[in-house]
Amino acid sequence: MAAPMELFCWSGGWGLPSVDLDSLAVLTYTRFTGAPLKIHKTSNPWQSPSGTLPALRTSDGKVITVPDKIITHLRKEKYNADYDLSARQGADTLAFMSLLEEKLLPVLIHTFWIDAKNYVEVTRKWYAEAMPFPLNFFLPGRMQRQYMERLQLLCGEHKSENEEELEKELYQEARECLTLLSQRLGSQKFFFGDAPASLDAFVFSHLALLLQAKLPSGKLQAHLRGLHNLCAYCTHILNLYFPRDGDEVPLPRQTPAAPETEEEPYRRRTQILSVLAGLAAMVGYALLSGIVSIQRTSPARAPGTRALGLAEEDEED
């Protein structure tokens, strides 16, 4: 008997089954199709077989990490939400997927990862509290830099060199995109009628994050909340497909203090050694990945003196 497929994705929060755009899209598609997956929700990407989230481990042990490729594999396994779509609807799916990536995704990245107030009070706060130590000290900042690079690639076609003008242009296009989605949805349950398709999984993941997060700076969020059919659309999908999901990451259980036994010193020593081993592994990873670099000082300094330079920006709250 073949091993079951396994999906590794980011944990839930803000009333959503996952706080990550890609993880939420894949999770939603699997609920639409009823794909039999063993789902691992985690706030530690190192628990994924690829070291990234989301990731699908197939029944033959292959690991797939790109959301589009994960969905393509599920289609090959006969879990196809687009099976009944016409050729015209298939073309519309491609057009709206491009619209989401070009017009809405850049502003979502800006809203959650670039806007200083939102990043500090919402995004970094969630990841820093959810991630295990010591990942929570450097990984949110590393993710932010990756999203900055992704945003630069997405905005390559925009000619404005003024940052304020560029931001204004991006938000205007995102508002137009939301309005167009609202008009296309109309009074339907889903974008192509009464049954959900892959487009619904991606639209929902983009809208739900923006709708559910409590953002101190929510310019686009205010526009979305004014489009009542899109809000009802998100609520309908959450209630129908994720009725028991979306809780915040549970806090570690507090166990009552027990009297110290003869084995307690040995247990403590084992715990300390485990922590030290974990820290050593983290430092090794940081050195290999370039997060931390060791630079030799100039000859003018005393022999043997070294300078430890942090290659990444400070992650202090």
Swiss-Prot record:
Post-translational modification, briefly? Ubiquitinated by PRKN during mitophagy, leading to its degradation and enhancement of mitophagy. Deubiquitinated by USP30.
Major subcellular site: mitochondrion
Q: Which domain of life is it from?
A: Eukaryota
Ordered alphabetically, the record's keywords are: Isopeptide bond, Membrane, Mitochondrion, Mitochondrion outer membrane, Protein transport, Transmembrane, Transmembrane helix, Transport, Ubl conjugation
Q: Note whether Transmembrane occurs among the keywords.
A: yes
CDD domains assigned to the protein according to its UniProt record, in alphabetical order: GST_C_Metaxin1_3, GST_N_Metaxin1_like
Q: Which GO terms describe its cellular component?
A: mitochondrial inner membrane; mitochondrion; SAM complex
Query: Which GO biological process categories is it annotated with?
Result: mitochondrion organization; protein transport
Residue(s) of cross-link: Glycyl lysine isopeptide (Lys-Gly) (interchain with G-Cter in ubiquitin)? 38, 41, 78, 168
Q: In which tissues is it expressed?
A: Ubiquitous. Higher levels are seen in the kidney as compared to other tissues.
Membrane-spanning residues: 272-292
InterPro entries noted in UniProt? Glutathione-S-Trfase_C_sf (IPR036282), Glutathione_S-Trfase (IPR040079), Metaxin1/3 (IPR017410), Metaxin_GST (IPR033468), Mito_Protein_Transport_Metaxin (IPR050931), Sam37/metaxin_N (IPR019564)
Q: Which cysteines are joined by disulfide bonds?
A: none
SUPFAM superfamilies per record: GST C-terminal domain-like (SSF47616)
Q: Coiled coil located at which positions?
A: none
State the compartments where it is located. Answer: Mitochondrion outer membrane
Q: Which Gene3D superfamilies match?
A: 1.20.1050.10
Q: Which family does it belong to?
A: Belongs to the metaxin family.
State the protein's purpose.
Involved in transport of proteins into the mitochondrion. Essential for embryonic development.
Q: How does it assemble?
A: Interacts with MTX2/metaxin-2. Associates with the mitochondrial contact site and cristae organizing system (MICOS) complex, composed of at least MICOS10/MIC10, CHCHD3/MIC19, CHCHD6/MIC25, APOOL/MIC27, IMMT/MIC60, APOO/MIC23/MIC26 and QIL1/MIC13. This complex was also known under the names MINOS or MitOS complex. The MICOS complex associates with mitochondrial outer membrane proteins SAMM50, MTX1 and MTX2 (together described as components of the mitochondrial outer membrane sorting assembly machinery (SAM) complex) and DNAJC11, mitochondrial inner membrane protein TMEM11 and with HSPA9.
Stated name of the protein: Metaxin-1
Q: What species does this protein belong to?
A: Mus musculus
